[in-house]
Amino acid sequence: MLAAHSICKDACVVVMEKFSPELVYQILVLRKNIFTDPQKPIQVLPAIYEINDPKPDDPVLVTTNFSITYFSVANEVEGSGLPAWLVVADAEGMSVLTAWAAGKFDSESIAKAVKQFGVGDKVSKKVIVLPGHVAVLSGELEEELPDWEIRVGPREAVDLPAYMKSALT
């Protein structure tokens, strides 16, 4: 606890009585997180992520690469035990609504991600679930991806498991 306090107070050197890799790791993570730039969003790598070992007929969910959004969606789906493909589109680390308002998360960027990550080759049931807050993109996305069925999911990640059980099975 004293080491963490010293790190928070900008200590240059911390001397510890015992060396424990687990403790040192936590202190290093604390040190790194204290000095991150709050104006630079923390991002995840744009990619297609497999959650709960999805099969080709499982649904494809779409979100942005803002870390909090990604982890919210991924954790809810993983916790439900339902398999899904999660396409994370590059939105410069912005949340869904922020990226949509800034023109960084639109039908073109979603279609680009779907094509770039070869999603069509991984799935047999071509159904994409958009975040509920960007339902207005569904018509444009149908034009960008004519072979796909576009569905509008819930507005909040916490509602995804119930939506997936009722609307996608």
Segments from the language model and where they lie:
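Conserved N-terminal glycine/acidic-rich loop preference
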Residues: 162
